[in-house]
């Protein structure tokens, strides 16, 4: 069951969004579909965010004939102090979570299995990187209507292809994959554009009580956390659409 997100409804959220399954023109039957707004709060560095997003996408696809979903991507930084050289991922996880070699191997096996279940392939992910510039590019892509595609491209680049999501060339390549103007993408990266907007959004979600990701906030009132199976998301969407919450 979804839980209430502490004070989420009180905070001003970003206006940018990528609307999933929005029809060009609604038939009378389609126009009666209830609409749910989903804010997917996540960090590119978070592997469970890749699992959670793919599971959520499956759930949205299952309910698309009955429920209209507006999907917004919101930023969160797991490692805001991470330097430009990054850190070895195994050393980072052992230090941060107190894992031993056996625990780390088991956790990675579980993650790979869960990824396979939702159609996402995890690669090596040899280092942990700073993701602030990735969040800036996701924000910019949202203004162009490509926020969802950019989020997917960055998750793929890091978690599947072991590329640095804070590297300029990787970011430009992701923009190219999303059919965005690469010259404009480079200008955004080099100028520090949208830093203030991203920092504001980060603060909003921290003040709203978000402390871990992925966090899926539905209608700014109901919170589901973690890389849940698609069925959990589907059940929540159907219940909330039915109750009108």
Q: Where do the model's predicted regions map?
A:
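C-terminal cap of thioredoxin/glutaredoxin-like
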Residues: 5, 16-20, 24-28, 33-65, ...
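Structural alpha/beta surface segment adjacent to cysteine/selenocysteine redox centers
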Residues: 53-161
């Amino acid at each position: 069951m979804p839980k209430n997100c502490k004070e989420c409804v009180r905070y001003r959220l970003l206006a940018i969004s990528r609307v999933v399954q929005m029809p060009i023109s609604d038939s009378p039957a389609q126009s009666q579909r209830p609409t749910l707004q989903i804010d997917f709060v996540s960090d590119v560095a978070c592997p469970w965010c890749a699992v959670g997003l793919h599971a959520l996408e499956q759930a949205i696809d299952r309910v698309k004939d009955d429920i209209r979903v507006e999907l917004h991507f919101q930023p969160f930084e797991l490692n805001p102090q991470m330097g430009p050289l990054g850190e070895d991922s195994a050393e980072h996880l052992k230090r941060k979570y107190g894992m031993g070699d056996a625990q780390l191997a088991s956790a990675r096996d579980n993650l790979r299995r869960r990824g396979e279940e939702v159609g996402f392939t995890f690669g090596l992910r040899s280092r942990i990187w700073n993701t602030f510039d990735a969040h800036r590019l996701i924000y910019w892509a949202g203004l162009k209507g490509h926020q969802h595609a950019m989020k997917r491209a960055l998750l793929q680049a890091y978690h599947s292809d072991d590329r640095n999501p804070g590297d300029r060339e990787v970011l430009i390549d992701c923009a190219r994959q999303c059919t965005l103007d690469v010259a404009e993408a480079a200008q955004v990266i080099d100028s520090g554009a949208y830093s203030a907007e991203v920092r504001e959004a980060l603060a909003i979600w921290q003040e709203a009580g978000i402390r871990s990701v992925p966090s899926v906030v539905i209608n700014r009132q109901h919170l589901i956390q973690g890389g849940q199976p698609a069925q959990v998301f589907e059940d929540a969407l159907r219940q909330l659409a039915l109750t009108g919450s």
